[in-house]
Every structure is written in structure tokens, then in C-alpha cells.
Amino acid sequence: KNIYIDYLEKFKNSKINAVGLSFVQNKDLIIYLKKKFSKFLMISKIENSEGLKNADEICKFSDAIMIDRGDLSAEIGDNNLYDAILKISNLTKKYGKPLIMATENLETMSKSNNPSKNDIISLGFSSQINSDVIMLSEETATSTKWKNIIIWLNNFLISRNKKLPQQYDDRIFWETVNLVKDYTLVVFTKKGLMLDKIFKKSNTNDVFVFTDTKKTKSISNFYKNAKCFVTGKINNKNLSKYYYDNI
């Protein structure tokens, strides 16, 4: 914990908006750091046995979750990796949080102009479990083919999104803060406190978020199906007039 505090103190006045927490064991570190450094979004990496055991509470209190398949596999064994990924992804979406899939997503493209079949299947699996972000590491950090890799991945993700089925239900209702799934949603929010509940219901359909705070925009940017716009100060007392005057 002290290591994180030392580093975050140095960067608290920077333009950094999110922090990755490695080898998170339980919720305690997350809660402490979120209170002390409320400016930052806390992205927890679940990558060992203890973190996997406490994955439910880690997903609940984090702003986003990253699955580091390399470290996780080394910690729990290759044979347990698949089930662990399913568990973490299900819990992440249970709490409506963004899911980041990391490690060797397009490793073969570091030396080749095209991905392997295994790369493509892996990316398809990540899409099926509703990963919001595909994270590249060595593919772009050390490879001379980094530009080609980014272009290929961008085109692949665009084509995948176009193929995702849009489902619609004749019923739409509010029940406290829960929204019915499968509709394009427009949300006005200051602190983004409802976003996790919204994304429990909307994994594939577009969600347009309007906010007057940078932190809400930062967390919205992690969701694959969210488009966020920073507005002038939102007046909750007369939101409809604000919309027609400013949008």
C-alpha cells in the first residue's frame, strides 16, 4: 500500500486519470486508495489465486477490471486459466464494470503481417465475454510493425461491432436505477454513479453519456459501447431546456 501512496502522491497533480493496481488481493486496498486519491479511476488487475478468490468484492469496488492472462496463468496454472477468465468476466459484468483483456492479444503480428488463427479465436472469445478494451503490450511497445497491428485490430473490432445483434424488447421501464436492456440509451449524469447499473443491462447497445465532469468521461471511455460528451454545467432543475438550448 505504501508503494502506491508514494507513487500516487507524485502524480496526483498530473493529467493521469486512471491507475492500474497490480496483484490486488481484496477490496481493502481499492477502498483506501479511492478515498485518498478520488481523482483517479482504480483499475484492478486480478492475476493471482488470492485475487481470484476475492474476485467478487474486487469487481464490486473497482472502477474497471483488467485480466492479465500471463501473470494469472503463471499463478494458477494454465489448466485453470479458462475457467478463471470466465469467472472474472462474469463478475465484472455482474457489477457493470468495464473489462480490459491484456497479454499476448496479437503477439504473432510482432513478426508477421497477419494474426494467427489462435489470435483471431482469442479475440473473438474476448468479444463474446464482453471485453470492453483489448490491451496491446509488447505488440506495440517493441515491434516495428506496431502501426500495422493497431490498424488491423481497429478494423477487426469495428467489423465485430457491426455484426453484434441488436435486440429490442417492446417493454421499457424504470425500476429505481435499473434500466431495461437492449435499447439505445441517452444518459445525463454528473458523477456517473449509475453507470455500473446501466451497463449491467446494456452490454452491446449504444449508450450516449452526457456529463459535465472529466472523471465521468474517463470511466465512460472504457466501455466499448459508450460514447461520452462533456457539456457545459448541467442544470438538473431544467434539463429539458438545457438539452434543446445546448445540444
Where are each of the predicted segments found?
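Non-catalytic helical/linker scaffolds that mediate oligomerization, partner binding
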Residues: 1-247
